[in-house]
Amino acid sequence: SGTKQWTQLLGTTSNDFAYGVTVDNSNNIYLTGYTTSVFENTTGIGGRDTFLVKYDSSGSQQWIQQFGSTLNDYGRGVTADSSDNIYVTGYTTGAIDSNTNSGSDDIFIAKFNSSGTKQWTQQIGTSALDYGRGVSVDSSDNIFVIGRTDGGLDGNSNAGGADLKSDIFLIKYNTSGTKQWTSQMGSSSYDSTWGIAVDNSSNIYVTGYTAGVLDWNSTFGNLDIFLVKYNTSGTKQWSRTMGTSSNDLSYAVTVDSANN
């Protein structure tokens, strides 16, 4: 009926930003973003830190974790798998845990169990700017991470050529954090992605916006919306663009039980 059930406020004495939210199979709620300070009962790592907070369905906070490198870290997307493990993606200017920074802003993906204990962290990047933006899982608990890169990830070529314009990427990990493959695509101009969804057949759908021409699609204006479908092996199935003569931006996508 649309009646508000509860509202919770979370913060520090400084600036705090939330970007991603998800629920698990028990209807617990998980929120991620970043803080410029230190949350109560946590420890600051350095600079801006990513946070992950868990609430139960009544809105009672269960725990909060603050993590990152000694530099700046930004949480952007969060999802839960069938065992209520939680995955957070974003980007870092440093090196998280035992990982190595590739030269600039790197993508990270971190796994937590339902009690808030971190299981592993993976970091990937180029010498250019790389941003993790969204994360989702399939029915086998494989993890898919999307975002944008100004370089060429894992041997992929940047579609912008020598100009190194931003491309979109899709990376698959298994539940142990082992990378399975990396796919990268883009136009000769700027491309950025924000939304991801996985259907019942483990096909992946990615949305965002482009300033160029993706594949054989038409361009409509300055910035156009795109939707791309990949299969579970990382092979692109199709791409579509739409837009007006002005700027059009897409930030989220979902699928229903019939895979629409």
Where are these predicted regions, by residue range?
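A sequence-level/structural motif corresponding to short, flexible coil/turn segments enriched
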Residues: 1-260
